[in-house]
Each structure stands twice: as structure tokens, then as C-alpha cells.
Amino acid sequence: MTFTASSSSCAITESPVVVALDYHERDKALAFVDKIDPRDCRLKVGKEMFTLFGPQLVRDLQQRGFDVFLDLKFHDIPNTTARAVAAAADLGVWMVNVHASGGARMMAAARDALAPFGKDAPLLIAVTVLTSMETSDLRDLGVTLSPAEHAERLARLTQQCGLDGVVCSAQEAVRFKQVFGAAFKLVTPGIRPAGSEAGDQRRIMTPEQALSAGVDYMVIGRPVTQSVDPAQTLKDINASLKREA
């Protein structure tokens, strides 16, 4: 079934599911999107697709009724990052992110850049430790902490800078909710329904486990985008989350 802009542009989803769009071809991406319902998920656009297809892709998704998480992980000097975040807000995205390792001044500048947008500002999230990274990877970078310890340090800095939350692994979610409170949003990649392959993620969880751990928004990619029936897969995931809740 195809959901057109006219039928779904006002749709609001309560689902915590964010589907990662990872396509090399715009037409294939939109063909997939036209098979799913914006009431069942939000969509994430990352570096590859945004580089290939630009802001118009985001507009195409919004016209179909979807909230968009612009996953570009800005990491630059404060002024440049602030301008990029403001540009994302102008585009009307639902969520945008920066790297917490950019430091406090960069994150504060990004936060301040969203002040003029008021209630229409996107959620501003910081990336802590990429879910593909393990202790050995951090050691190669001169970081002697474990991924969990380093992520918590960066999450604390993020909260102190007034951002809305962090991207973290599901394994860190329980601790983060305890330390940073319920209002601090946790966005988690590496979520895969039981039976899915791990792919290039190293620290993964099922949707049900993630919800129990305190994750607010869970990013799911290939288990949905490569499903023979993605609409039904999304409905099954959401149904399982409602049972878990």
C-alpha cells in the first residue's frame, strides 16, 4: 500500500521506532518509504543519502508525512556547527545530532542556534560512543576508559550543555536513565529483532530489550528495509513493544 502526502502529512506517530534509510538510489528509497505508514515509524537520513540527494530528499519524506532524523553527526568549530544545526532546523527536521566529543562550547553553540525556533526546534542529540566501537577501538584513540565509561562521561557533558539527549548503546540505557533522568532522551542504534544478523553493529539488543532498558527512540535498519513486507514488520515490532510496555 502507498501512503501519499495528502493522506498522511498530518500523521503523528507515538512509535519509538526510527527506520534507517540506507540506499544508494533515491527511487529505491522512496519506493520503500511508499510501502510503510508514517504512523508506524520515523525515518533517519544519514551522511550517504544526504550527500547524494540533499535537502530535497528530506522534503520528499516530509511530504509523505514522516518525521525525519537528520543523522549527520556535526563535529566542527562552534560557529560552523551552530550554523549547520540552524540549517537543519530551517529544513524542518524532527531531530538532528552532533558529536559530544566536539566539546562543551560546540554543543552550547548548537543549542543556542536553535533558540529562535522555539517549539518548532528539532530535538538536539549528541553522539557519545559509536555502537561499532569496542574497548580496543577506544584504546587505539588513546582513551583508556571502557565504551560505557566514556559514553557516560560524554553524556554528562551533553546534559550540562542543555541538549535533549544522547545517542548511546542499549547496554548504557539503564544506567543513563538512572543517572540523567527520564526527560533526557536516549536514542539507540544497533536494535534488531530476534533472529536478525548483527551486521556491522557490535553492541545490539532487540526492540523489547531496548524498551525495557529505557531507550526512547530505537534505530532499526535492514531488518525493516530488507523485509519482504516492511509494513507488517513494523506493525509486528510496534505490537511487541506495546506488549512489553
From Swiss-Prot:
Pathway: Pyrimidine metabolism; UMP biosynthesis via de novo pathway; UMP from orotate: step 2/2
InterPro entries assigned to the protein according to its UniProt record, in alphabetical order: Aldolase_TIM (IPR013785), OMPdecase (IPR014732), OMPdecase_AS (IPR018089), OMPdecase_bac (IPR047596), OMPdeCOase_dom (IPR001754), RibuloseP-bd_barrel (IPR011060)
GO BP terms, alphabetized: 'de novo' pyrimidine nucleobase biosynthetic process; 'de novo' UMP biosynthetic process
Gene Ontology CC: cytosol
UniProt superkingdom: Bacteria
Catalyzed reactions per annotation: orotidine 5'-phosphate + H(+) = UMP + CO2
Enzyme Commission no: 4.1.1.23
Family: Belongs to the OMP decarboxylase family. Type 1 subfamily.
Primary role: Catalyzes the decarboxylation of orotidine 5'-monophosphate (OMP) to uridine 5'-monophosphate (UMP).
Record protein name field: Orotidine 5'-phosphate decarboxylase
